[in-house]
Amino acid sequence: MLLGKRQRPPIKRTTSLSEIKFDLNQPSEQEPSDHQIQLVNVDEHRQVHQRLLDQRLLAMVSPRGTQRRHSSDYSEDFLRSCSLCKRLLVHGRDIYMYRGDRAFCSLECRQQQITVDERKEKKKGSVRSTIVVATGTTTGERVSAAV
């Protein structure tokens, strides 16, 4: 036994085909001859035929009905058109995403939106970095300091 290894219980074996015994010496059931076939009246034949048709029809119909749909059937609103140029996005073509909720038809549209957003952030950042501090002087001078 190796160090650090623990013994496992023996694997329980299942019945294999070699363990199943078939008695081939028994006579098999003979197929009915033409004389043994019973004639079925017309009404019984219609009932049997109708049951077979019903089973075939039910086999084709999904038990869940037509309510089942795939997630690809539903596309989010932002995946329908380009966020910049509003062009319809074609199914099966590449969609370029930006910030998780914006879809674009091309790399160019995506890059234009990125530059627009960067400009907006720079403008907001420059406004936030300037803080106006009022001094205690009577002249009302203001001092701004960059943070």
Swiss-Prot record:
Induction: Down-regulated in response to mild as well as prolonged energy depletion. Up-regulated by glucose, sucrose and mannose. A zinc finger (FLZ-type) spans 77-121. One of its GO terms (cellular component) is cytosol. Its main location: nucleus. One of its GO terms (molecular function) is kinase binding. PANTHER family: FCS-LIKE ZINC FINGER 5 (PTHR33059:SF4). Belongs to the FLZ family. Pfam families: zf-FLZ (PF04570). This is FCS-Like Zinc finger 5. GO terms for biological process: response to glucose; response to mannose; response to starvation; response to sucrose. It is found in: Nucleus; Cytoplasm. Interacts with KIN10 and KIN11 via its FLZ-type zinc finger domain. Interacts with KINB3 via its N-terminal part. Interacts with DELLA proteins GAI and RGA. The keyword Manganese does not apply.
